Amino acid sequence: MNYVDQNKRKWLSLGGIALGISILPNSVLAMVSTPKPRILTFRNINTGERLSGEFSLAKGFSPAMLKKLDYLMRDKRTNQVHKMDPNLFQKFYNIQTNLGLRNAEIEVICGYRSASTNAMRRRQSRGVAKNSYHIKGKAIDFRIAGVPLIKVKSSAESLRNGGVGYYPTSNFIHVDTGPVRTWKGV
């Protein structure tokens, strides 16, 4: 086979593919090219506030939604707001996806924690880390309404990124964006 015949075959193949794509219904093309909206719903159990929205857009995180999430995750004692690590929210989306959930209500027990609140908590409980990831805006304690805690723990651990603490007696899971590690608390 000579060079011209090989080129002809390549062009005919590409033309066939292009023709095939052009006759697909627009709805199929839209499904293929449009990413799924990444929506999360949170309820802060300390304030009663609820927030639901798309945290991630096609070109990255939604700055407006992240700002609202920062406010929702604020220190419950001092009312101080701190920028949260956006990767936490991606982690929550992945946890839900692993569980086969969409937009389930995530109950926030603790998001950001100021240094003074953390010091106070350390005096009350030896289980509070001196350099907690909560102080850095890189940790959230939570549970998902209606989902057994052990399933949420397994889903979080399967991601193999960041820390996962399991607190069955206190009824929450801790996730953070630090090094990979797991532990069981009370």
Swiss-Prot record:
Record keywords, A-Z: Cell wall biogenesis/degradation, Hydrolase, Metal-binding, Metalloprotease, Protease, Signal, Zinc
EC number: 3.4.-.-
UniProt pathway annotation: Cell wall biogenesis; cell wall polysaccharide biosynthesis
InterPro entries assigned to the protein according to its UniProt record, in alphabetical order: DUF882, Hedgehog_sig/DD-Pept_Zn-bd_sf
Signal peptide coordinates: 1-30
Binding site for Zn(2+): 134, 141, 174
Reported cofactor(s): Zn(2+)
Cofactor: how bound: Binds 1 zinc ion per subunit.
Gene Ontology CC: membrane
Enzyme kind, highest EC tier: hydrolase
Function description: L,D-endopeptidase that cleaves meso-diaminopimelic acid (mDAP)-mDAP cross-links in peptidoglycan. It works in conjunction with other elongation-specific D,D-endopeptidases to make space for efficient incorporation of nascent peptidoglycan strands into the sacculus and thus enable cell wall expansion.
Family, similarity comment: Belongs to the peptidase M15 family.
Stated name of the protein: Probable peptidoglycan L,D-endopeptidase MepK
Organism: Haemophilus influenzae (strain ATCC 51907 / DSM 11121 / KW20 / Rd)
Lineage start: Bacteria, Pseudomonadati, Pseudomonadota, Gammaproteobacteria, Pasteurellales
Primary gene name: mepK
